[in-house]
């Protein structure tokens, strides 16, 4: 069973990220962590039901999980005491990347979520699940998401030195 969360209130924070404090930065990072977890969960459901796209699904699930893990560490550092705030100056400048990553993951989640017709079919006992992407589309998504993961990881490394 999936839990769906309306992230629109969190998007308000994206407009103020350029001058964000630790709590607002953590809220923005939390939004991406939440949506990453949902996308990874949806990918897992597809990997169980759709055998012919397993490799693509696993690749997409791995990169989304990697982004989630990096951002969980960023969030942990952002929520530390005020003594660490000056050290996180690079992380505080990630507003554009955070917003773009959130948008891409939100679009991905929308494409992976069950449609009304699928829900009706499930009620009738028919379990039809079709992977909505070609291998080429997955390759593009993975490449794009890898860039975000690298950006967030590098910012984290700079702030920890």
Predicted features and spans:
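Intrinsically disordered, low-complexity regulatory regions with latent secondary structure
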Residues: 2-4, 9, 99, 103
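N-terminal amphipathic alpha-helical segments
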Residues: 6, 10-93, 108, 112, ...
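Short, well-structured alpha-helical interface segments that form or flank functional binding sites
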Residues: 62, 96, 140
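Elongated alpha-helical scaffolds
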Residues: 96-110
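Acidic/serine-rich, low-complexity amphipathic helices located in mid- to C-terminal regulatory regions
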Residues: 100, 104, 138-157
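Individual transmembrane alpha-helices with interfacial aromatic-anchor signatures
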Residues: 128-140
């Amino acid at each position: 069973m999936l839990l769906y969360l309306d992230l629109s209130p969190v998007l308000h924070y994206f407009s103020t990220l350029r001058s964000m404090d630790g709590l607002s930065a953590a809220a923005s990072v939390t939004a991406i962590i939440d949506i990453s977890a949902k996308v990874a969960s949806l990918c897992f459901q597809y990997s169980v039901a759709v055998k012919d796209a397993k490799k693509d699904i696993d690749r997409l699930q791995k990169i989304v999980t990697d982004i989630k893990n990096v951002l969980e560490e960023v969030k942990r550092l952002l929520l530390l005491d005020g003594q660490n705030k000056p050290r996180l100056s690079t992380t505080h400048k990630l507003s554009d990347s955070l917003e773009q990553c959130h948008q891409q993951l939100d679009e991905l989640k929308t494409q992976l979520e069950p449609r009304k017709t699928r829900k009706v079919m499930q009620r009738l006992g028919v379990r039809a699940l079709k992977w909505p992407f070609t291998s080429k589309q997955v390759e593009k998504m993975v490449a794009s998401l890898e860039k975000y993961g690298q950006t967030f990881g590098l910012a984290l490394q700079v702030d920890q030195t």
